């Protein structure tokens, strides 16, 4: 069973995860074709970070022109329009992320922009799923990490969203460094938050960068693509898949 593990060391955005998947082998021209096929008008920038101490890719979706509050209903309508032409089956996959995202909103509020979420984040999610589909990823897992509280509204949201993050013996990741939409992707799409063990055979390792040119301190998301060998007792039989769900799992 092919799986992707995500390890977060610090700063994390959805675009950084896409950058890591490009570094893993997803061609940027493929992502451009995905946008074209879906009738999506969106521009992005991608480049290898030549100054990084390790191979890392930078990726960034340019902001869409959108003014005023960003309500969940508008965000979901944008998501539906992205999926309907080529991948209508991904609409439900997005709902998993949006449910997690909603848990980070202040009580009685429905404006996603309060948490730093913007309309182009929907395009980031679509391209992330395109990357996972290209790599034939069947399930996504997140390696547990502890989170340090922050003071901003976005930090409060990320902490509220990541209910499953758990804890490790490593340094805690500041909630200020985790974008709420990236937090919702991990919480909504991860089959589980577990450590890699002997069942997982890593085939590729890649990094996403939050900078196109800084040499250190920016390659804080590591992605591992590989296979589970113990299929009889595999977690895959018991947990949500990226593109679908266990029929016994209540969403």
Regions found by a protein language model. Name each.
Residues 1-5:
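Extreme N-terminal starter segment of soluble prokaryotic enzymes
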Residues 11, 59, 186:
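Divalent metal-coordination and catalytic microenvironments
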Residues 15-27, 84, 126-136:
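Alpha-helical support elements that line or immediately flank enzyme active sites
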Residues 22-24, 244-251:
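Short, surface-exposed ligand-recognition loops at beta-strand->loop->(often short) alpha-helix junctions
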Residues 23-108, 174-176, 180-183, 196-200:
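Glycine-rich nucleotide/cofactor/substrate-binding loop typically near the N-terminus or early
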Residues 28-30, 133-247:
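Mobile "lid/hinge" segments at catalytic clefts and subdomain interfaces of large enzymes
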Residues 101-153:
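Gly/Ser-rich oxyanion-binding loop with an adjacent helix/lid
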């Amino acid at each position: 069973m092919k799986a992707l593990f995500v390890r977060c060391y610090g700063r994390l955005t959805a675009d950084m995860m896409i950058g890591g998947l490009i570094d893993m082998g997803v061609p940027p021209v493929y992502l451009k074709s995905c946008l074209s096929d879906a009738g999506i008008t969106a521009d992005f920038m991608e480049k290898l970070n030549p100054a990084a101490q390790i191979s890392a890719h930078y990726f960034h979706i340019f902001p869409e022109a959108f003014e005023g509050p960003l309500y969940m209903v508008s965000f979901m309508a944008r998501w539906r329009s992205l999926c309907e032409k080529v991948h209508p089956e991904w609409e439900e996959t997005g709902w998993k992320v949006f449910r997690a995202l909603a848990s980070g909103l202040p009580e009685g509020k429905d404006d996603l922009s309060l948490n730093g979420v913007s309309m182009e984040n929907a395009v980031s999610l679509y391209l992330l799923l395109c990357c996972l589909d290209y790599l034939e990823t069947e399930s996504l897992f997140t390696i547990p990490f502890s989170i340090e509280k922050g003071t901003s509204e976005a930090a409060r949201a990320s902490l509220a969203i990541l209910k499953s993050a758990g804890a490790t013996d490593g340094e805690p990741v500041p909630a200020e460094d985790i974008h709420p939409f990236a937090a919702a992707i991990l919480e909504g799409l991860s089959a589980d938050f577990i450590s890699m063990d002997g069942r997982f055979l890593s085939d590729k390792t890649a990094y996403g960068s939050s900078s196109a040119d800084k040499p250190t301190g920016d390659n804080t998301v590591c992605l591992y693509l590989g296979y589970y060998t113990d299929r009889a007792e595999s977690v895959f039989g018991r947990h949500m898949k990226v593109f679908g769900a266990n029929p016994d799992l209540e969403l």
